[in-house]
A protein has these predicted regions:
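Short phosphate/oxyanion-binding micro-motifs
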Residues: 1-152, 162-185, 193
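A composition/secondary-structure signal for short, hydrophobic, low-basic-content segments
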Residues: 4-5, 209, 266, 322
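Generic structural motif
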Residues: 28, 89, 114, 128, ...
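Amphipathic alpha-helical interaction motifs in eukaryotic regulatory proteins
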Residues: 37-41, 87, 140, 144, ...
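Short amphipathic alpha-helical interaction elements and helix-loop-helix interfaces
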Residues: 42, 54, 92-93, 115, ...
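Metal-dependent phosphoester-hydrolase catalytic domains
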Residues: 95-104, 162-243
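Arg/Lys-enriched, amphipathic patches
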Residues: 119-124, 154-158, 162-164, 219-335
């Protein structure tokens, strides 16, 4: 196989196309993490790439998303910067290398999937004012080194490049940019570069919380090994709530009043309440992903979808929906 040209070696294996979610966080605080968790539940990305996490070793343990394994690279010595790659815990992933200096933050991982070509993913942050030449040299050198070590691997390079001139780097490594829209105001700072021809262009999602960078979604072919379970829940909506309130107000509670003992009254109370609930908020068996956070409710997901629809249609209502989404998240977390 050593005599087979590199391009032919890559074609000999089926490419692995994970679904990838990316955003520049500008501080991965709790509110942004919660909305990111909602996005993860809706879009089910296999990989989440984050730039400008603004974390350190002490804070990373509190920044976990259920069902994902974390790979962090923190900026040393000062606030800001930092990158992370989160991979679904059903994926075989190995961290290859990372680099953090005063000018760049970068982390590289390799994903192995049976019968597919290995996939190397890099998440990089090139801050404003950093040396373009230094970053380009780092990218070129690291990509070449990893390509030589893993000759059948394919690449996804994503991050905030802050207008870094990447034309020569892309041409040398046969990389195509899949981001065709502005990612922060009127600038395209965040990119997804790949040599996998089967990918379609990235999709634009609304920013998380009060962020000013949009999210990028790269739709792929996810593994079919996600674990689901059936759970029993009461179906509650605004209509059923009103009916429930009315039923409670009109209930005579005769069974409770007629009971002769304390235990009898408690039992009658429970039976009456159970009957009212079964009438107006019946139980249903529903399928959900195992270990799904209980605070990510159907209403939270519905509002998040509406926010993204408004954002992509350039409707001004998305800001109001974004504020509503934040209020719902906080309320749901308190319950």
């Amino acid at each position: 196989s050593n005599n087979v040209p590199l391009a032919q070696q890559k074609r000999s294996k089926v490419p692995y196309l994970p679904t990838l979610l990316y955003t520049n966080c500008r501080s991965l605080n709790h509110w942004k993490l919660e909305e990111l968790s909602v996005y993860a539940e809706i879009h089910k990305p296999d990989v989440i790439c984050l730039t400008e996490t603004w974390l350190d070793k002490n804070k990373e343990s509190a920044r976990q998303i259920v069902n994902y394994d974390n790979h962090f690279c923190h900026r040393k010595g000062r606030l800001g910067g930092g990158v992370a790659i989160l991979t679904s815990n059903v994926i075989s992933c190995k961290e290859l290398c990372s680099n953090t200096t005063s000018t760049i933050s970068a982390i590289w991982v390799k994903i192995n999937k049976e019968k597919c070509a290995p996939l190397i993913i890099c998440c990089i942050y090139h801050p404003p004012g950093a040396s373009n030449d230094s970053t380009l040299e780092y990218l070129s050198t690291t990509t070449l080194k990893l390509a030589q070590k893993h000759p059948t691997a394919q690449f996804i390079i994503t991050g905030d490049f802050n207008r870094l001139p990447l034309e020569n780097y892309q041409q040398q490594n046969n990389l195509t940019n899949l981001v065709t829209f502005h990612t922060r105001e009127n600038a395209t700072l965040d990119l997804i570069l790949t040599d996998i021809a089967e990918y379609s262009p990235a999709t634009k999602l609304a920013p998380i919380a009060d962020n000013d960078h949009c999210c990028l979604l790269l739709n792929g072919v996810p593994p079919k090994t996600r674990k689901y379970q059936r759970v029993v829940r009461r179906m509650v909506n605004e209509h059923s709530k009103r009916a429930l309130y009315q039923a409670v107000a009109l209930e005579s509670w005769s069974g409770v009043l007629e009971a002769q003992t304390v235990d009898g009254k408690v039992e009658a109370l429970h039976k009456t309440i159970e009957h009212i609930l079964d009438t107006h908020c019946p139980k249903r068996s529903v399928k959900q992903r195992q270990n799904k956070p209980q605070w990510i409710t159907g209403s939270v997901i519905k509002t998040s979808r509406a926010k993204n629809k408004a954002y992509n249609n350039d409707q001004k209502s998305w800001k109001a929906l974004n504020a509503l989404s934040q209020r719902m998240l906080r309320s749901s977390k308190r319950k």
